[in-house]
Regions:
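Recognition helix of helix-turn-helix/homeodomain-like DNA-binding domains
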Residues: 31-46
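Short, charged recognition helix plus adjacent turn
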Residues: 1, 38, 67-80
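Residues within the helices of the helix-turn-helix
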Residues: 12, 23, 53
Length: 80
């Protein structure tokens, strides 16, 4: 699994846990719906740290909490 796929899955997981839609997440995070849709659809292969930080702020969690999920433990090495 790539970091992009893991971020997508983590965002979806957090939305499910909090019972919020992706549209609501975009609004409370201050990012555009299209940016979030690109992350979730996989069109955005490398989400920026600043976008993840905005999502974390919207969810009222730390970046550390976002990345502490087990899904990030066994990522593939990505060489560009």
């Amino acid at each position: 699994m790539t970091i992009g796929e893991a971020c997508k899955m983590r965002i979806e997981q957090l939305c499910l846990e909090r019972n919020i839609t992706l549209n609501k997440l975009a609004i409370i995070s201050g990012i555009t719906q299209s940016t979030l849709n690109n992350i979730i659809s996989g069109r955005n292969k490398s989400t920026t740290v600043s976008t993840i930080k905005k999502i974390c702020d919207g969810l009222e969690i730390s970046v550390l909490e976002f990345f502490s999920a087990e899904i990030f433990n066994d990522l593939e090495q990505e060489i560009v």
